[in-house]
Regions:
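Membrane-proximal transmembrane or re-entrant/amphipathic helices at the cytosolic face
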Residues: 1-15, 448-460, 477-543
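N-terminal membrane topogenesis motif
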Residues: 1-43, 96-104, 138-143, 217, ...
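Interhelical loop/hinge segments that connect adjacent transmembrane helices in multipass membrane
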Residues: 2-24, 199, 203, 217-261, ...
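Signature of the first transmembrane helix
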Residues: 23-88, 104, 117-121, 151, ...
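Transmembrane helical elements of multi-pass membrane transporters/channels
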Residues: 26-43, 205-217, 221, 237-307, ...
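Membrane-interface helix-loop junctions in multi-pass transport and translocation proteins
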Residues: 50-52, 56-57, 172, 183-215, ...
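Helix-loop junctions and terminal segments of transmembrane helices
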Residues: 76-92, 167, 226, 283, ...
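Interfacial segments at transmembrane-helix termini and the short loops linking adjacent helices
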Residues: 124-148, 342-377, 451, 455, ...
Length: 543
C-alpha cells in the first residue's frame, strides 16, 4: 500500500473508535437473543417438513448439509484468520495490514470455491452415489444439491465482510442481519414446502436467506468501516503465509471437528440408510439448536481474547486470560445446563409435543435424544477454552479434543456393533455420545493446565453450579411426564413451557442460595426492576 493510501486509511477511522473498549456484553446479549429466536425457528421447522416430505426426503436434506460442511473445509480455516488478525490489527490501529490480509484471503477463496462448484457439477454422478440419492428424488435432489452448494460456496467468499465485522467486535450488527435472513427463510419454507415444492422449496428458501444475510453484511461493512479497502492488487505473499500458517492449523482442526460433529449422521448413512441419518438429525436437533444460545458467548470470546492479549502487558496477561476463562465458562455452562437438564430429564414429553403422532421410532428416538442432550452438556464445556485459545493463536491445543475423540470413537463404535450384533441407529448414536463425553473431559483438563487455572476454582466456579439446573429439572421431571402424556399435543406444549419457566425460577433460587457471589446476587436482584421498566416502556409505547 502506498503512503497516500495508508494516510487515507488512517485518517478515515473516526476518532471515537481510537480508544473504543471491547463490546463484549452487548455482543453476547444480542447474540443470545438472535440465537434464541433462531432456536425457535429451527425446532419448529422439522415437524412441519417431516409431515409434508417424509423421513427419507428429510434424511436426504440433512445429508446435503453434511456434504457442504465438508466442502467448507477447503478454505484454509480463513474465517478464524480474518477474525483473529482483524481484532489484533484493530487493537494496534494497523488497518493497512488488515486490508492486505483480507484482500489476500479473498483472492484465494473466490477461485477455489468456483473450482469446487465446477467439480460438483461435472462429477454429479459420483456425488449422487456418495449421497445415496434415492431414485424417487433423483431430479429434485440434484436441483437442491446444486442450489445449496452454489450459494454456500459463494457465501464462503463473501464471509470476508461478516468476519471483518466480528473482528471489529461489531458482532451485534452481524446478528441483526443473520436474524433477518433466517426469518425470511422460515417464512419461505412455510410457503414453499407447504405449497408442495418439497426439497426444492427448502433449497430455494436457503438461497433467499443467504442472499439477504450476506447482502446486508456487505452493505454494513462498507458503510461503517471507512478504512476497509479490498483489491487483488493488495494481496501479498507475507499475508498468504499468515493465512496458511494459522489458517492451515485451523483447517486441519476444522476437518477433525466437522468429522466429529457429523460422525453419527455419516455412520448412519453409510452403515444403515438415509432414513437413519434423518433420525439422527431429529435426535440431535433440540440439543444442537439450544446449544446455539450458550455459543453466543463463544462467538464473542475469540475476538475479545485476541484484543485482551494484544492490549495487556506481560505481567497481567496470564491472569486476565485465566479470569476471563473462568467467568466465561461459568456463565456459558449455567446457560447450557438450563436447557440440557430439561432435555435430558424430560425427553419423551418434549418429543411428544414436538412431533406428535408423526414421531418416528419413539423408543429409539427417546434414548438418542437423552444421549445427545447429556453429551452436548460436556461438549459445550469445551467451548470457552477453544475459543480463547484460538484468540491467542494456540489452535493446536484443540487437538486435545479432536484426537482423543477419534480414539474413543475407534473403541465405542465397534463395541456398539458387538453389543447389538448389528449396525443400529441407537448403537451408533450412543457410541458417539460416549466418545464426546470422554474427549471433552480430556480437553477441559488440558485447558486448565495451559491457562494456569486452579482445578479447585474450576470445580467450584464452573462444574458445581452447573449441577444445580439438573436438580431443579429432576424435581419437576415426574409431574411433567405424568401430565404431558395424558394431554393433547398443544396442551402438553403449554405444560412444558410453563414447567420450563418454573424450572428457571427454581434454578435461580437454588443458585442464589448456594452458588452466586455478592456481585451476582446484586445483579439478580435488579432483574425485577429491569423487567418492570421494560414493561412500563412497552405500555407507554403502546399508548
Amino acid at each position: 500500500m502506498d503512503a497516500e493510501q495508508q494516510t487515507k486509511t488512517e485518517s478515515a477511522q473516526p476518532e471515537i473508535e481510537r480508544r473504543e473498549p471491547p463490546r463484549l456484553r452487548k455482543n453476547v446479549v444480542t447474540t443470545i437473543g438472535a440465537r434464541a429466536l433462531y432456536m425457535i425457528t429451527r425446532v419448529g421447522i422439522p415437524p412441519f417438513v417431516l409431515a409434508r416430505i417424509g423421513l427419507e426426503a428429510y434424511g436426504l436434506w440433512t445429508t446435503i448439509f453434511l456434504l457442504v460442511s465438508y466442502l467448507g473445509l477447503s478454505t484454509l480455516g480463513i474465517s478464524n484468520v480474518y477474525i483473529k488478525y482483524v481484532a489484533e490489527y484493530h487493537a494496534r490501529r494497523e488497518y493497512d495490514k488488515a486490508n492486505t490480509l483480507l484482500s489476500t484471503g479473498l483472492s484465494i477463496t473466490v477461485p477455489l470455491c468456483s473450482a469446487l462448484y465446477a467439480a460438483i457439477w461435472l462429477g454429479w454422478g459420483w456425488v449422487a452415489k456418495l449421497l445415496h440419492l434415492p431414485t424417487s428424488h433423483a431430479a429434485d435432489g440434484k436441483e437442491a444439491v446444486l442450489i445449496v452448494v452454489g450459494i454456500f460456496l459463494a457465501s464462503i467468499s463473501l464471509n470476508v465482510f461478516s468476519d471483518t465485522l466480528n473482528g471489529m467486535q461489531q458482532i451485534a450488527a452481524n446478528q441483526y442481519f443473520w436474524t433477518a435472513g433466517f426469518l425470511a427463510e422460515f417464512v419461505l419454507i412455510v410457503v414453499l414446502v407447504g405449497g408442495g415444492r418439497g426439497i426444492r422449496g427448502l433449497a430455494e428458501a436457503y438461497l433467499a436467506r443467504t442472499v439477504i444475510e450476506d447482502g446486508l453484511k456487505m452493505w454494513w461493512a462498507w458503510r461503517k468501516l471507512p478504512w476497509l479497502h479490498l483489491s487483488p492488487r493488495l494481496a501479498r505473499r507475507a499475508a498468504l503465509k499468515t493465512v496458511i500458517h494459522f489458517g492451515g492449523l485451523v483447517q486441519f482442526q476444522s476437518l477433525l471437528t466437522t468429522m466429529i460433529n457429523s460422525i453419527e449422521r455419516m455412520l448412519a448413512l453409510l452403515l444403515v440408510n438415509v432414513s437413519a441419518a434423518g433420525l439422527m438429525d431429529f435426535a440431535k436437533k433440540w440439543p444442537q439448536s439450544f446449544s446455539s444460545i450458550p455459543m453466543a458467548f463463544f462467538a464473542a470470546f475469540l475476538p475479545a481474547a485476541s484484543h485482551l492479549e494484544a492490549s495487556s502487558d506481560a505481567g497481567t496477561k496470564q491472569k486476565n486470560l485465566s479470569d476471563f476463562y473462568l467467568r466465561g465458562a461459568r456463565y456459558s455452562n449455567l446457560c447450557t445446563a438450563y436447557f440440557c437438564s430439561m432435555m435430558a430429564l424430560w425427553t419423551y414429553p418434549i418429543l411428544h409435543v414436538w412431533l406428535g403422532a408423526k414421531m418416528p421410532m419413539p423408543g429409539v428416538l427417546t434414548m438418542l435424544f437423552f444421549a445427545f442432550s447429556v453429551s452436548m452438556q460436556f461438549h459445550m464445556l469445551t467451548g470457552p477454552g477453544t475459543s480463547i485459545l484460538r484468540g491467542m493463536g494456540m489452535v493446536w491445543e484443540e487437538f486435545y479434543y479432536s484426537v482423543p475423540n477419534l480414539i474413543f470413537l475407534a473403541v465405542t463404535v465397534p463395541l456398539s456393533y458387538l453389543y447389538f450384533e448389528a449396525w443400529t441407529t441407537l448403537g451408533i448414536g450412543v457410541a458417539v455420545a460416549a466418545a464426546t463425553i470422554c474427549s471433552a473431559c480430556v480437553l477441559m483438563v488440558r485447558v486448565i493446565f495451559v491457562l494456569r487455572v486452579s482445578a479447585g476454582a474450576y470445580v467450584k466456579q464452573v462444574l458445581l453450579p452447573g449441577c444445580v439446573p439438573y436438580a431443579s429439572a429432576a424435581l419437576l421431571a415426574w409431574p411433567v411426564w405424568w401430565t404431558t402424556v395424558r394431554l393433547g399435543r398443544w396442551t402438553g406444549a403449554g405444560v412444558v413451557l410453563a414447567a420450563g419457566a418454573l424450572h428457571g425460577a427454581i434454578m435461580m433460587a437454588l443458585l442464589y442460595g448456594s452458588a452466586l457471589n455478592a456481585q451476582e446476587k446484586q445483579q439478580v436482584s435488579r432483574i425485577p426492576t429491569l423487567v418492570g421498566r421494560w414493561l412500563q416502556s412497552a405500555r407507554t409505547a403502546a399508548q
